[in-house]
Amino acid sequence: MKRYISILLLAAFCFLLSGCSSKQQTETEQTEGISETVEVERPEEMPEMCQIGKMEFALPTNCTYYGEAEVEGSETIYLYMGDYQVVVSSDPFPHDISLTDMDEAALELYIGSLSEGSYQIAGCQAAVVGKYPYLLLAYHDEALETDYSVYHTIIDGQVYTFVGYREGDEPVSEQEQEFLYELVSTMTEAPEEDEA
């Protein structure tokens, strides 16, 4: 899982460096010297609901929907609230379990595996938000002097990650933490499409 978190955060950082102009249609991700172009789909107007994996979540009115992309098989959605940035991703989990299925020992090993990347976990707590259990993780990247708030859950073998952060050494405000919580609290199963 450290690979998924690292890829997600690296993709988000590269996404920001690309300029984020409204006319820009592609994002370039630099990963170990390999350049990859990711097409970002941009709708004409902001949707009320976003779907990712088998789930969907509601967008608050005070945010900007930047678009979505697929980064190394990970569905990814980008949102902004002023200088605060949120990246939502969905990845398949190699084992058919949910977060609630893990016993304490397995959960500790899992959390340990998340902290093995360049982003070190500064804090972790379990939380139930809406209907679903989450790990609320706090990451710190010393090189970027940036803190990340991460809501992370596994539902039916699918990992859902909500990452919220600000660039540089600006602390994440209480309002921004509430914004991320609001997004997570609206997540629910997407209705199945009728097969005609």
Question: Which residues does each PLM region occupy?
Answer:
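Short, hydrophobic/aromatic-rich segments at coil-to-beta transitions
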Residues: 43-49, 73, 128-138
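N-terminal, intrinsically disordered, polar/charged segments of Gram-positive cell-envelope systems
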Residues: 22-61, 67, 194-196
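Signature of long, low-cysteine stretches enriched in small and polar/charged residues
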Residues: 108-156
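Short, solvent-exposed coil/turn segments at beta-strand boundaries
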Residues: 61-62, 81-85, 130-132, 153-160
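Secretory pathway targeting signatures of secreted, lumenal, and periplasmic proteins
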Residues: 53-104
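C-terminal motif of bacterial Sec signal peptides marking the signal peptidase cleavage site
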Residues: 16-19
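Positively charged n-region of N-terminal signal peptides that target proteins for export
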Residues: 1-5, 9
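Surface-exposed amphipathic alpha-helical segments
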Residues: 63, 161-196
